[in-house]
Amino acid sequence: MNYKNSKFYVENISIGKLTRSFQTPFYCYSKSRLNQNIKNFNKNFEKTKPLICFSVKSNSNSKLLKIIKDNGLGADVVSIGELQKVLKVGFKPNKIVFSGVGKTTNELDFAIKKKILLINVES
């Protein structure tokens, strides 16, 4: 994101052009900024290489999730809907953590059958 000639740009596209192309308000994400932020974040953990999981509850946009997956991060989900979504986006089961309270037997069975990495049991 930057300014050129007193106009605000995201990845070389002016916000003015976007507002003429899309109904406002809208969300605008920078793929290059997201990739860079993930790279910088991961750099701090090079020695330990933990599985860093993105909270799908915070933003379940499929295109955003694909970028996150393509950068090697995992997914932290709290519902069967989120679990199904990240599987559809292409997250590997061994990079999915199922958190949250109030899991149904159906949700737990589904998660176990998909062989996800971890189910957090909370009160």
Where are the predicted features?
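A charged N-terminal "starter" segment
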Residues: 1-118
